[in-house]
Amino acid sequence: MTKSELIERLASQQPHLPAKAVEDAVKEMLEHMAATLADGERIEIRGFGSFSLHYRAPRIGRNPKTGEKVELEGKYVPHFKPGKELRDRANIYA
């Protein structure tokens, strides 16, 4: 599901809200979540999961085209850990 598909579905389920208001709300929520992670904070949505940052240590990688070694810096990457309810629902369809 893409962001536009999510907005479309939410707007169709809430016909009393203008589609633009739903779009603005979704964009604002995602922007706030990104800013929270950028500040190094953890986000927990009960029943859904949690978002946090994990540190990737510096390492030596390879350029896939040339095969030459490339030094990669350490960095933080977003990490999502699904909650129990989400895992259980996903296993129904697996």
From Swiss-Prot:
Keyword set includes DNA-binding: yes
Alphabetized UniProt keyword annotations: DNA recombination, DNA-binding, Transcription, Transcription regulation, Translation regulation
GO BP terms, alphabetized: DNA recombination; regulation of DNA-templated transcription; regulation of translation
Gene Ontology CC annotations of this record: chromosome; cytosol
Family classification: Belongs to the bacterial histone-like protein family.
Assembly information from the UniProt record: Heterodimer of an alpha and a beta chain.
Function description: This protein is one of the two subunits of integration host factor, a specific DNA-binding protein that functions in genetic recombination as well as in transcriptional and translational control.
Protein name as catalogued: Integration host factor subunit beta
